Amino acid sequence: MEVDSIAPQPQEKIEEIESADLVVAILADLDSESLAAVCNDLQTLEGSPRLAVLQNEKSGAAAHAHAETAEKSTFPFLISRPLLRPDPAGTPALSMFAAYQSVFAAGEKLGARACCVVASKLDNAPPRWICQMAKPMLEKEIDLVLPRYAPHKFEGLMNSSIISPVTRSLYGKRIHNPMGPDLGVSQRLYRKMLGAERNPRLNGIHALASLASAALCANSQVYEVNLGARVYPPTDWANISSLMAQILSPFFLDMERNAVFWQRMRGSVPLPTIGDPVPVPQDTGTLEISRMVEMFQLGNRDLQEIWGLVLPPATLFELRKLSRVPVEEFHMPDELWARIIYDFALAHRLHMITRDHLLKSMTPLYLAWVASYALELEKEKGSGIEQRLERLSAAYESCKSYLVSRWRWPDRFNP
């Protein structure tokens, strides 16, 4: 981030934000009414902290409208600047990671005690939720505040099936959304992220993939805040392989860096939570289950050479049996799925093949888990979703000894 050009605003407006206690970045595409509501809420924070609100500026006509909104705003702390860069290479996850580093750099420039990021639109969000996220860092010196969204059945499944349960198993805290994306970060933690980015020995680190683990490994305090249901962008199932590689590679790298810490952890405990649970929305989404099962069957036929490098014989045998099951009876056991993820994390560490190729080869296995999960939840309500994901997380914990054994003795432990 070019800190000397922190906002394309008139000089008098820049001078008003030479320093701030709290930097809030608006990455979500909020309308003027929603943006005003966020700004109004922030002004009610106890102690009247100095504010800097960075609104993501879009290109073309949208950029002009955003800049005009910021300039005419009655909020002197609202500025408009490009935070999310265009993504011609088709790497949305990496673009998002870079945006957070830019926000943290702005926080460092302004000497902010904390940074918050509003990356999502929310359904039925609690009043003043942005204040609930900011207050713990300003008043209690909490280092990380993460969202707990009201769950959708078929949204955020990469987080629900991999990121969240693996984080819980590794670090012993029941974090529902380790990568946010709506979150609050203390000065101590965002400076740590910036320092890691500048360290050439930590190549590949990304803020969203490492925030939760960095806080937990430092024994910092982490809170969750109950939010409404997140409005997710449509899932691009045609390009899910690329997205998996973009998200899981930095996640697995971070897992490797922290191995000394997480190998000692056993069990898990819940996090302190702010606010009351938000009612679960009606969920009418559907998935093409038959198509997902077909993709798994094709993968089982065509990817045996790669899977054979990663997965032990017992797992390959179970997958071959699963590939012959009719769609209506299709079921992937949670323990099998957890062991598969752990095996791919180990293969990523050992560079068995190019990492991008390795992670993309996971796609048929991921689709198999999604199909199995969708079949179970076709008629479930909100409570069923959370209970189902709790069983999955418990399976990851029960299989952690498998991970530790394979991690320590990858050549000897091959059941």
Predicted regions and their residues:
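A recurrent flexible, glycine/aromatic-enriched loop bordering the glycosyltransferase active site
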Residues: 149-156, 169-184, 201
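Conserved nucleotide-sugar donor-binding catalytic segment
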Residues: 196-202
